[in-house]
Amino acid sequence: MSKVARSSSESDVQLWETEEDDMTEGDLGYGLGRKPGGIYEIEFSHRSRKRSDGKNFSPPPFPRKGEERNEASFQYSKHKSQQDTFPQVSRISNYRRQSSTVDSNSELSNEELRQCLNETLEEVEMLKTELEASQRQLRGKEEALKILQSMAILGKATSHTQAVLQKTMEQNRSLEKEINALQWEIEFDHNRFKNIEESWIQKYDRLNCENAVLKENLKVKTEEIKMLKSDNAVLNQRYLEALAMLDIKQQKMAQENMCCDKSGFAEASGLELAVLGACLCHGPGGNPCSCARMAASTRKLLLQLKQELEILQKSKEEAYVMADAFRIAFEQQLMRKNDQALQLTQMDKMHKKATKWMNWKHLKEDGFPSPRSKKTFGQRLLGMLPSENSSKRMEDQDSPQEVLKMLIDLLNDKEEALAHQRKVSYMLARALEDKDTASNENKEKNPIKENFPFNNPWRKTSEFSVLGDPIHSSVCILNSVGCICSIQHSQIDPNYRTLKRSHSLPSSIIF
């Protein structure tokens, strides 16, 4: 079976080669004058020569068991490409030739077939070697193409990376320049700050030294001031003791002398300086003359008199105000007395009517007047009054009218006492205001006398005069240090019956 297959394959190869030879020699499909069914000789030498030249276009043999698939696919593709090149007319002529040559090939001998088989095997081996070489070349070319592609891709990537690298290098250079500039600025600022810090440290040390020196000087000065204050306090105490030992006139003279000695012409007022400067006749040494001094002293006296006149006007106004206050108080008191008198008359009428009605009622019930077992209205009022001799004079003062009159007198006395208290408080307030203004003026003129606001406590005792009214004969008002207003009823209208005890303000009321 293998021999038959080999012979059939060899015959197919021979037929294919004859067809190719016909194509090369110029046969256009007419069979070169041959008829179908005829027997013709085949030249194997010429065919073998063409095979050796490498121009065999025979179709590929059947694949053996040991052949590779890539070789078969390569041969098949080559054969298919060659077959596609022939025209359709040549294919029909080839089929006719094959049918005519089958009979002629069957008559060949076995030896010739073996020789042909050996030759074909050799050619197949040569073709295998050539195929392997061409495959190696193809593989090498593919690898070279891959390498070239990778190199092209790498070239593109490297160009991009080179551009990016150049940009990064430029950025790095610019950043390095900026960093160098910033470092230089930092070093410059650091040096400048060091210099400033050193200068401030020197200033701080110098100020600390000066502060220490000033503290020491301040301590010394404070000690000196304390010593001077203590000496001044002692001298002021001695001065006050000496003034207390003198009379009022001597005290005034001493105060005037002290003011003149302290002030002199160095502490003269603006008016005195103006008068002294207006003088044209200058004495020896540029001092003002006696006439200028006299004019300055007269100006000063004139100002003092003006101040005293203002004080007198104020006191006059106060006197008018006090007189008006007394007048208003007495008018109010008279109005109250009139109202109380009207009320008393009405009460008397009502009391008389009530007594008559009660007596008539008792007479109607019992036929005789009832004894007075209870206290009367006047006795009850007297019992409410806390007096020592009220129990002794209970029988004499049994009528309620007398008791009411006594109560009215007491109320009037209280009202008068309150009015006097108001006046005295007003007077004391004005006196204190005057003293405050005088002390402020003295402080402005003589600032050394700050510790002595009351140098002359007996100066304004004459301002408080004895006050009198038609009812009260003695009203005593003391000085501003302690004032007690006492009111005694030594002279009272004889028409009114009063108690024997004295009605006065309590001793606890002190202004």
Curated annotation (Swiss-Prot):
Coiled-coil regions listed: 105-243, 293-325
A cellular component annotation (GO) from this entry: cytoplasm
Q: Which InterPro entries match?
A: CCDC125 (IPR034608)
Region Disordered: start-end pairs: 1-110
Tell me, what is an example of a GO biological process annotation in this record?
negative regulation of Rho protein signal transduction
Which GO terms label this protein's molecular function in UniProt?
identical protein binding
Q: Where is the composition biased (Polar residues)?
A: 1-12, 83-108
Keyword annotations from UniProtKB, A to Z? Coiled coil, Cytoplasm, Phosphoprotein
In Swiss-Prot or TrEMBL terms, this protein is called Coiled-coil domain-containing protein 125
Q: Which organism is it from?
A: Homo sapiens (Human)
